[in-house]
């Protein structure tokens, strides 16, 4: 089973898609970008674009075109060219997605899939994403993340 997750810069989940393990990454990327639950803010200034960081598994033309079709500037780690020297590399951004997946995997029902139907599992994932947003909102408005009972 594959889980495809789109997060904002601080790790807040924006969309989640589950699929069989044999689904190509480009197809899953298109579904993930189309499943965003919030409208994107208008570009200010007009030439401003949103960036999409992807790992080397998405280094193909369909993934690149899927990002461009949805007005993202893709940043895809490349298999095609050698990596630049360390002083010219951009900072890593993929860890934000990995951290959000680690937050989601704290729940046993998500780490190990017990549900037979994919729709039930997706609902559980979406509920967990909503809890992540609730915890974040609670922390931002009340201060301490430990001030409520788990």
State where each predicted segment sits:
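Mobile genetic element proteins and their domesticated derivatives, centered on retroelements
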Residues: 5-6, 11, 29, 55, ...
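A general lysine-centric signal
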Residues: 2-3, 117
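Generic structural signal for secondary-structure transition and capping sites
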Residues: 38-41, 109, 132, 136
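Short, structured patches in soluble enzyme cores that scaffold and shape functional sites
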Residues: 3-9, 17-20, 56, 78
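C-terminal domain-tail junction helix/linker
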Residues: 123-150
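Active-site beta-loop-alpha junctions of metal-dependent nucleic acid enzymes
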Residues: 17-42
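Helix-centered, glycine/charged polyanion-binding patches within enzymatic domains
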Residues: 22, 41-118
